[in-house]
From Swiss-Prot:
Xref: SMART domains: RL11
Keywords, comma-separated and alphabetical: Methylation, Ribonucleoprotein, Ribosomal protein, RNA-binding, rRNA-binding
Gene: rplK
Protein name as it appears in the record: Large ribosomal subunit protein uL11
Organism: Mycobacterium sp. (strain JLS)
One GO BP: translation
Subunit description: Part of the ribosomal stalk of the 50S ribosomal subunit. Interacts with L10 and the large rRNA to form the base of the stalk. L10 forms an elongated spine to which L12 dimers bind in a sequential fashion forming a multimeric L10(L12)X complex.
Molecular-function GO term, any one: structural constituent of ribosome
Keyword rRNA-binding: yes
Length: 142
């Protein structure tokens, strides 16, 4: 078995699916770790091609020899809620001004999508986490 490579950095970014390019914020974040920026952009865009229109968080592990691996996460709950509610952004005063409504079915659907990234044992707990996010954005859950 080959010896393990030493990890020198972990970079977390949220990039539009299929639209990674060397411009900020991607270029500077990767450049300071010595990663080949174009190589990452091509690999990320190829991996997220099917999810265009969503913001996909990515965790990039950089190794000593400047090679890297990356893991894709599920889209942020806030973005999924905004899409489900059909509004461009959440409320500036979430507990006073409500901007939209979502149903429990929509919340459960988002919880199903996010289950792998959430710290929940079952779908009901995951749905409550998503409902809390919705509440903090001024979206009513019915």
């Amino acid at each position: 078995m080959a010896p393990k490579k030493k990890v020198t950095g972990l970079i977390k970014l949220q990039i539009q699916a299929g639209q990674a390019n060397p411009a900020p914020p991607v270029g500077p974040a990767l450049g300071q770790h010595g990663v080949n920026i174009m190589e990452f952009c091509k690999a990320y865009n190829a991996a997220t091609e099917s999810q265009r229109g969503n913001v996909i968080p990515v965790e990039i592990t950089v190794y000593e020899d400047r090679s890297f691996t990356f893991a894709l996460k599920t889209p942020p709950a806030a973005k999924l809620l905004l899409k489900a509610a059909g509004v461009p952004k959440g409320s500036g005063e979430p507990h006073k001004t409500k901007v939209a409504k979502v149903t429990w079915d929509q919340v459960r659907e988002i919880a199903e999508t996010k289950k792998s990234d959430l710290n929940a044992n079952d779908i009901d707990q995951a749905a409550k986490i998503i409902a809390g996010t919705a509440r903090s954005m001024g979206i009513t859950v019915e």
